[in-house]
Amino acid sequence: MTAVATHAVRKIFLIATEESGDRLGASLMRELRDRLGAAVRFEGVGGRAMAREGLTSLFPIEELSIIGLSAVARRLPTILRHIRTAAHAALQAAPDVLVIIDSPDFTHRVARRVRARDPSIPIVNYVSPTVWAWRPGRAKVMRKYVDHVLALLPFEPDEYRRLQGPPCSYVGHPLTEQIATLRPNPEEQLRRDAAPPVLLVLPGSRRSEIRHHMAVFGEALGLLQAQGVAFELILPTMPHLEALIAEALKHWPLQPRVVVGENDKRAAFRIARAALAKSGTVTLELAVAGVPMVTAYRAGQLEAWIVRRRITSASVILANLVVGENVAPEYLQEECTAPTLAAALRDVLADSPLRQRQLAAFGRIDAIMSTGAQSPSACAADIVLGLLPAAAPALR
């Protein structure tokens, strides 16, 4: 743990524009306050979690919670205005450290503006952009405006060295602190092994993702049922998506049990035998929970064309990348069809070689993702504090 003299008030400027980044930012703020006490001040951009830790956001992050090229194009004037606002505020604050959290299309533009106007401000990038999957040249460019990358995935430091990027340290994924909420107790394990098996369907956490996946997922599950495969279907979602999910389910040939909220989602993970999931962070959650899966991804045609031309990794599935082998089947764009998904689901529900390969790989995940005795936020705080100037004025 890094020791820091607390005779001067340290100013940390943080920028997080998505809910996941907001949670990371809040945990980092708590850890820094534990270390520095009253000798730290926070400014920047964040959501509700960071607000509970005392941050007054420059603007509501909901205005930036968008996905997809068409959505970005529609909101471009707002995005550009907020980039200018955040960069100007960071320069005015003259913080001891600027911490940008995820959302690279936004936060990196802010960081570049800040570095160009005041190179003395250390900049930490918490959550690496996916340079290992596409646009790898970004890593080398980041050296110009990022002093240290805090990686959530254990393979990322090696990728930054290979790509000649800035210093990068694995600080741990927040999921490693939530293992108990994802894994079954003995009673839940009995349900996981019982008939009919519980099958999770996870179509995404954004409106555009749900629109792209719900129809084909419903068709695939209908085919699976028509083939005589028995299962109990559970669809976890969040309150703000409940109405959209309900509307899409009107067109499904079978009806899942819909559970709402993070706690009920975790409870469903603990009893599930298998899952059909849109690729993303949820695949890593499933791997940590020990739930074999079939993964899929569909996007708009323009976005898919651009991504396909630039993708460089052997897999886009986080679970596969972390365990180092392609154990979870992934069906992207035109490969994401109802018959293909149904056939793979039939396999993963049964005691098949596909299922056994996944379970064996997921059994190694604790060792792969371990950070020892320290929490991810503690590891992150060590690096942030290590970048503080040796001496600072009481207030800037």
UniProtKB/Swiss-Prot annotation:
Pathway involvement of the protein, from the record: Bacterial outer membrane biogenesis; LPS lipid A biosynthesis
GO cellular component annotations of the record: membrane
EC number: 2.4.1.182
Domain of life: Bacteria
InterPro entries: Glyco_trans_19
GO biological process: lipid A biosynthetic process
Function text: Condensation of UDP-2,3-diacylglucosamine and 2,3-diacylglucosamine-1-phosphate to form lipid A disaccharide, a precursor of lipid A, a phosphorylated glycolipid that anchors the lipopolysaccharide to the outer membrane of the cell.
Protein name: Lipid-A-disaccharide synthase
Gene: lpxB
